[in-house]
From Swiss-Prot:
InterPro entries tied to this protein: Aldolase_TIM, DapA-like, NanA, Schiff_base-form_aldolases_AS, Schiff_base-form_aldolases_CS
Record Gene3D superfamilies: Aldolase class I
Underlying gene: nanA
Classification via PANTHER family: N-ACETYLNEURAMINATE LYASE (PTHR42849:SF1)
Active site, renumbered: Y137, K165
Protein name, per record: N-acetylneuraminate lyase
Subcellular location(s) of the protein: Cytoplasm
Gene Ontology CC annotations of this record: cytosol
Positions contributing to aceneuramate binding: S47, T48, T167, G189, D191, E192, S208
Function, in words: Catalyzes the reversible aldol cleavage of N-acetylneuraminic acid (sialic acid; Neu5Ac) to form pyruvate and N-acetylmannosamine (ManNAc) via a Schiff base intermediate.
Organism lineage string: Bacteria, Pseudomonadati, Pseudomonadota, Gammaproteobacteria, Enterobacterales
Pathway the protein contributes to: Amino-sugar metabolism; N-acetylneuraminate degradation; D-fructose 6-phosphate from N-acetylneuraminate: step 1/5
Amino acid sequence: MATNLRGVMAALLTPFDQQQALDKASLRRLVQFNIQQGIDGLYVGGSTGEAFVQSLSEREQVLEIVAEETKGKIKLIAHVGCVSTAESQQLAASAKRYGFDAVSAVTPFYYPFSFEEHCDHYRAIIDSADGLPMVVYNIPALSGVKLTLDQINTLVTLPGVGALKQTSGDLYQMEQIRREHPDLVLYNGYDEIFASGLLAGADGGIGSTYNIMGWRYQGIVKALKEGDIQTAQKLQTECNKVIDLLIKTGVFRGLKTVLHYMDVVSVPLCRKPFGPVDEKYLPELKALAQQLMQERG
């Protein structure tokens, strides 16, 4: 059902203008930039996309624009997760209407929901997605929901679930999931362990830094398929040097600043309460943008 979703999927950023409104022109440029750099698909409206500081209407607009801009050229996964099941269902129905290939939802957070309530939440979204496969999104560090291996096994075997986005540094658990579910599409979620995640059993990844250097991650996939561990390690090291800087600057605003210097995003701002990049990092981010543009050619 979801085997065609394997690959390198950029977790799409959402550009805003100086007034904090959705910047549709920059969003369209960013989609095209990702297509041109050779990624396999886009994961739209997730953590990287600042979904939880947007209205439901804005999230639907983003889905519609991305679908219009891609025109079936790449795979599209719509993150529709909200704390509210009803709102998640509304977004899932919109994703189906706009022609997305799959939906995804983070575990409902903030309130201490029972595991059965989590399962019911996913069942309802799957029903509203009307046949689109579900990508369960496990990100305990941000959601605060720490699923056990048995609970993950239960979620990924719900009817309609086709994939898991495993944003966790627990590579042992990644391997356990792969061993238990050989046909499950399994995404590595932390960019800094992409190569390790693939070796632990992931089919590909969904990541924020793919927006600026997706070709490097494709290079890691290619190297590992060819048994070239040395090249994969070298590429991962180069990716991690970038990630080291982005962690200092704030990842999303740092990425937007790099894309601003690449003439992709007009305004390098995230939505408040996120603040701007500290000016002391701007020279490093500008140099990084120039380096990546030269490398990409």
